[in-house]
């Protein structure tokens, strides 16, 4: 039985070598997941999250030289930047997993459960947005659009 069995550890390399990589164990610690999801699917969420977060970052952060220059001008140290980057990627991957595992059924309870899980992915993506703002030196947007 796969429920409650531990997920195997797999390092998912970042396409940009100077940016931090994430391990599937990091996702297991962030979310309550077990072997029913599978290590390859978790790794796929992380790869997609890399693409999403890297797409939201300015192009100047993809060169090691310009990244170091950015860190010195924005008064953010490398460790803080790395933590914010990991937080952004992890929460985006968690939001992707939450979106894919929304439980809808034909009962009213299923619709309520689905709505709760959608707000969970919205909260996770707000953390992603705040982390990217912290990395780039932009102000955090705290306005909720209807």
Regions found by a protein language model. Give the residues of each.
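Conserved short "hinge" loops at termini or chain/domain junctions
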Residues: 1-72, 133-146
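Alpha-helix boundary/capping detector
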Residues: 52-57, 72-75, 111-115, 119
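Short, glycine/alanine-rich amphipathic alpha-helical segment
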Residues: 71-84
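Short loop/turn elements at secondary-structure junctions
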Residues: 81-146
